[in-house]
Amino acid sequence: MSNYFDKIAKVNYEGANSTNPFAFKHYNPNEVILGKTVEEHLRLAVCYWHTFCWTGNDMFGAGSLDRSWQKTGDLLVGAKQKAEIAFEFFQKLGVPYYSFHDVDIAPESNNFKEYLHNFNTIVDILEKKQSETGVKLLWGTANCFTNPRYMSGASTNPNPEVFAWAAAQVFTAMNATQRLGGENYVLWGGREGYETLLNTDLKREREQIGRFMQLVVEHKYKIGFQGTLLIEPKPQEPTKHQYDYDVATVYGFLKQFGLENEIKVNIEANHATLAGHTFQHEIATATSLGIFGSIDANRGDPQLGWDTDQFPNSVEENTLAMYEILKAGGFTTGGFNFDAKIRRQSTDPYDLFHAHIGAMDVLALSLKRAAKMIEDQTLQKVVDNRYAGWDQELGQKILSGKASLEDLAKIVETQGLDPKPVSGQQEYLENLVNSYLYR
């Protein structure tokens, strides 16, 4: 095993009173909550791209991070070194999963044969490292947005040759995901949108991306992939307006192309912020529509209008998110993937550990708080009581289709219905949630 992070042997759980910065205070993977271990509930994954590919660059400055694998003259040699160091990190952190884009793990090329050679070379290494360490692939995906060929979109591109290139990448990445035992395959349309309607045919582009998703579903069945297909919603950035704006928009798209039973959503907290929603709202919408799949765990900055991809640090926000997930029965094939990056000034390699340790503790503590809310059922009882009328005769008659508008008008008139407003008790419920958060 690589020994890049030689100052750490293994991050362990030491409890809330520990002062060791390289120990978990709340994340105890073997602790049983609601019949499952914390590890089974959270299904944590480290992402390859932000953790091992980002150089620390931004729009106003060059890379600030010193990473040995990014300095090799031979990019494939660097990719091999990166894989070794990545699995050292996964093992020492103790996460069960990881995730990647195709070009995160292997050098890209404008020559497809060279792309395949590079990619397959690294997939061979990943397969071996998974076998050696027991670390599994939560999901794989293809980067169909960074290369200049995709500046006008991938599946939505006005040039069908670009569509074909994207299809070739997804074909390759899906096959690799299946080979590596990946439990999901993600589709994020980073360039599937537009900058201006002056040069855009919305109807045509929507039909193109719809056909692309149908091709992905067809290939899933052709190769016997048992995982879940996921679309990741985002309203904008890098395009002005993206077609997968939010969970509700994605559901409408899936319905249009008959894919609502084939594809679910991978929800990112920061993307919810950009869409003007809370993280909790997007999860609740997905579970209510039956398309909840997985989570990209991070946070945004409400004062900034871009995807900051910071590590989650709010127990309050994540307890409410976890509550919605637990109410829906928890994850099946999905999990919490840390789509988050350290800050540009966090140049010490061990800052990667601090970031992930803190985020894992936040999610574990949020799980415990949400589980207590589920066990007590106090909040749910208030909601059930609020809608109790719909379980009674009039409510059931309306929902079952046994009452027309005329019937309802007669009921109001003959029975003299005069419903009175009932308190929503928002302040009480907010206090109730705080009593779980800060006990």
Swiss-Prot record:
Active site per UniProt: 101, 104
First-tier enzyme category under EC: isomerase
Main subcellular localisation: cytoplasm
InterPro entries: Xyl_isomerase-like_sf, Xylose_isom_bac, Xylose_isomerase
Location(s) in or outside the cell: Cytoplasm
Comment on bound cofactor: Binds 2 magnesium ions per subunit.
Binding site for Mg(2+) 2: 268, 271, 307, 309
EC number, UniProt record: 5.3.1.5
Record Gene3D superfamilies: Divalent-metal-dependent TIM barrel enzymes (3.20.20.150)
GO biological process, one term: D-xylose metabolic process
Gene Ontology MF terms in the entry: magnesium ion binding; xylose isomerase activity
Annotated disulfide bonds: none
Membrane-spanning residues: none
Reactions this protein catalyses: alpha-D-xylose = alpha-D-xylulofuranose
Cofactor field: Mg(2+)
GO cellular component, one term: cytoplasm
Binding site for Mg(2+) 1: 232, 268, 296, 339
Keyword set, alphabetical order: Carbohydrate metabolism, Cytoplasm, Isomerase, Magnesium, Metal-binding, Xylose metabolism
PANTHER family: PTHR48408, XYLOSE ISOMERASE (PTHR48408:SF1)
Subunit field text: Homotetramer.
HAMAP family (alphabetical): Xylose_isom_A
Family label: Belongs to the xylose isomerase family.
Name of the protein in its database record: Xylose isomerase
Naturally occurring in which organism (per UniProt): Histophilus somni (strain 2336)
